[in-house]
């Protein structure tokens, strides 16, 4: 995500292409399951927080790197994995995390979710008012260091 943002800022097309290719051919196919979940994250001690972080980072990649010719928001792997599917999977558990089907995070469970960037980016990309509405309701200025550390974009509206 950081490489993509710096590459775009500096106009480094080679690195932007590298990041886009890595998203399509490494990150999305290897980190997302067919249902849109992130199995590597759901096996960790903080599966909820890390799943959110992973989706935030991927959504930010889509936001930073998408062009008319290469729209990562619309990209889908041959086996159906996409950022849209990832958002659709996690969204219900942002709305009501008591329905989270995996173990609770061992720490900071009560601090999540906050105003996650994937919600506002996804709302814009997919014209989904529900994503924006829930984003507006969530905490926009978290105070817990662990939450701040795992919130890759704190002001998504400027992106």
Go through the PLM ranges and name each one.
Residues 1-52:
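Active-site cradle of extracellular carbohydrate-active enzymes
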Residues 72-159:
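CBM-like carbohydrate-recognition segments
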Residues 4, 17-20, 59-62, 87-91:
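Non-transmembrane alpha-helical segments in soluble domains
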Residues 51-55, 62, 83, 87:
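Aromatic-rich carbohydrate-recognition surfaces in CAZymes
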Residues 42, 54-57, 76-79:
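Solvent-exposed, flexible loop/coil residues
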Residues 8, 24, 28, 63-70, ...:
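Sec-exported extracytoplasmic/periplasmic mature domains
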Residues 1-13, 55-71, 115-130:
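Well-ordered alpha-helical scaffold segments within catalytic/enzyme domains
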Residues 42-48, 69-76:
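Active-site rim elements
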């Amino acid at each position: 995500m950081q490489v993509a943002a710096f590459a775009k800022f500096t106009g480094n097309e080679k690195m932007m292409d590298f990041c886009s290719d890595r998203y399509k051919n490494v990150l999305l196919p290897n980190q997302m399951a067919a249902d849109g979940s992130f199995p590597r994250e759901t096996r960790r001690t903080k599966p909820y927080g890390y799943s959110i972080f992973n989706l935030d980072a991927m959504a930010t990649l889509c936001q930073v790197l998408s062009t008319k010719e290469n729209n990562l928001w619309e990209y889908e792997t041959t086996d159906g994995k996409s950022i849209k599917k990832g958002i659709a999977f996690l969204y219900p558990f942002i709305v009501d995390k008591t329905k989270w089907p995996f173990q609770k995070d061992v720490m900071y469970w009560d601090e999540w979710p906050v105003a996650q960037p994937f919600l506002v980016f996804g709302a814009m990309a997919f014209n989904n008012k529900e994503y924006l509405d829930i984003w507006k309701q969530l905490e926009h200025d978290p105070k817990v260091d662990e939450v701040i550390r795992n919130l890759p974009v704190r002001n998504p509206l400027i992106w």
